[in-house]
Every structure is written in structure tokens, then in C-alpha cells.
Amino acid sequence: MTDHALLLANLGSPASTEVADVRRYLNQFLMDPYVIDLPWPLRRLLVSLILIKRPAASAHAYASIWWDEGSPLVVLSRRLQEAMKTHWSHGPVELAMRYGEPSIEATLQRLADQGVRQVTLAPLYPQFADSTTTTVIEEAKRVVRQRSLDLRFSVLPPFYDQPEYLDALVASAKPYLEQGFDHLLLSFHGLPERHLHKLDPSGHCLKGDDCCRTASPAVLATCYRAQCLRSAELFAERMGLRPEQWSVSFQSRLGRAKWIEPYTETRLDELAAQGVKKLLVMCPAFVADCIETLEEIGDRGREQFVEAGGESLQLVPCLNDHPDWVAALKVLCERAPQAL
């Protein structure tokens, strides 16, 4: 075995559907300053208020989609890890979660103890956001610094416009699109608008309806919304979809702050009102199915759409461990630049 490891990193999951485990997970997640970017006292107060009721509600939601093997996100990520072991010939392939287990800290320590000296860190987020990509990288930096680990890193950058990722999306989604549909909704995870403004010193973001399409390369590099729209446009182009056949929305809004629009819950009602009966929904910001896809879209979203007058909502599975995605990820990781 060589000393160059691949570390796949995703968001994470509670250890179980018990309320105590869900509360512990939500506390770790929401107290991350890259997720709720408020000063510590305000963040602590807000999270404490959220944790009064949300753990029980979230535990119920997790229980509705939990598998016998465990959390769908963790199970599917493990399957991807196992598949990558047959493609990554440079050393061990490990999986870590930013929140929950297996932790980034324990995984990096284990790799260092095994004699690994080079790590390709792969945050499994196609589009860039501080609350996803940055927090994974910063956690790895913290661990290396505090534990004095002798590790060098290359980091997989956002791959929202990379042909390998887009081709894998096409390969995984094509069988569902070929079954016939009235409309395709590309539902990305949402973000508070302030997250975009914070990373845009130029003041370009959200200044007009067309701001994402006219973004400079510098703005595009850190604008999550622009990267989502670019992914959607490139996917639709590859699939030969006409503009009226598809649209984009943003899901998973939390709290009362203004988040990027349009909201998925609003679009579901609008599409039903427009006469759409057979709706396909893809979630291209997620590479593995999780509570946001299986429960928020596959269960609650379907129920909302049907109640609004639609007939069926088909959730297209995420990339998960699709063979084309495994092959694509190998290529993307092997050309990851040196960083950290």
C-alpha cells in the first residue's frame, strides 16, 4: 500500500433516530460558525431555542427514511467508499463526516498512524459554499494543527461545471427522464442570502435577475447560486431539454432570514397550478440521498405537490454509487491541486 490516501467527506448524520442523538447532531451542525454565521453568544442562544422542539420533529423525519443498515447518507457514502477502493490505486480510501461519525479528526489521526503522508481531501459538494466546502477544509486544518499531524493535502475543488460530474448526472438521470414527464425541477439546497453577500466584495450578487449569468470569474468562484444555475444549464443542455421543460429552485430553508430564491416549496405549488401533472425532481447539490432528498422531497414534497393538484412526483436518485459517478470521481480526485 502506498502512502497517498483518498478521504471522502460529506455532511453527516445522527447516530440513530433517537431524539438525544438527533439533538447532539443538530447542536454540532448548527453551532458551526460557517453554518450559522452569527457571533458566538447569538449563535448559542439561537441554537438553544432551535433545540427545544426541532430534535423531536427531526427524529420523526429521520425515522421515516431510516434503513435497516442505518442512515441512508452514511450507508450510501460507505458504498461509494467501497466502490472507490477498486479505482483509487494510490493508497487507502476513507470516509469522514463533518458532523457525527466517522469524524474527520479520528479519520485523519488513523491515517497518520498508518504512515499515510499525502491525503486527497474530497469534499463531496459540487457547488461551493462556506457551510459545506470551507468548513470541511477548515476542520482538516484544525485537526492537523492541533494534533501536529505530518500530512500534506490536495483538495478536490468544486466540480459544478466539470464534464465528468455532468456526464455522470446525465447517465444516472436519463432512465427517469426517458419515462416521460411534464416538467423537471432541479432543486438545490438553499443558503441565506447573506452568505452570498459576505463572499462578494464586488457587490454584484443578487443585484438583478440576471446577476448569476453575468458574474465575473472571481464572483463565480464563490457564488453558490451562480454555480447551481450553471450546473443546471449545462445539465439541461446535455439532455437536450427546452427551457420550458425545466426550472431551478432552492430547498431546506431554516429560520426567518431571506434565503436564495425561488423556494422549492413555492415552485411545487406553482407547477401544480400551471397544470403540471407528472413532475420529476432532481437534487444535483447532493451526491448521496439523504433526509433532504428522501424525506423533504420524496415524502413531504410529493404530498404537497399532489395536494396542490399534481398527479405524481418522481424523485430521481442522487449519484450515490452509480458506476459513472465512481469513475468520474476518480478522475476529479486525481487532478485535485495541492492545497492546505
UniProtKB/Swiss-Prot annotation:
It catalyses: heme b + 2 H(+) = protoporphyrin IX + Fe(2+). Its main location: cytoplasm. It is an enzyme of class 4 (lyase). It is found in: Cytoplasm. The keyword Iron applies. It comes from the Bacteria. Its EC number is 4.98.1.1. Keywords: Cytoplasm, Heme biosynthesis, Iron, Lyase, Metal-binding, Porphyrin biosynthesis. GO terms for biological process: heme biosynthetic process. The keyword Magnesium does not apply. Pfam families: Ferrochelatase. Pathway: Porphyrin-containing compound metabolism; protoheme biosynthesis; protoheme from protoporphyrin-IX: step 1/1. Fe cation binds at H189, E292. Transmembrane segments: none annotated. One of its GO terms (cellular component) is cytoplasm. GO terms for molecular function: ferrochelatase activity; metal ion binding. Belongs to the ferrochelatase family. Catalyzes the ferrous insertion into protoporphyrin IX. This is Ferrochelatase.
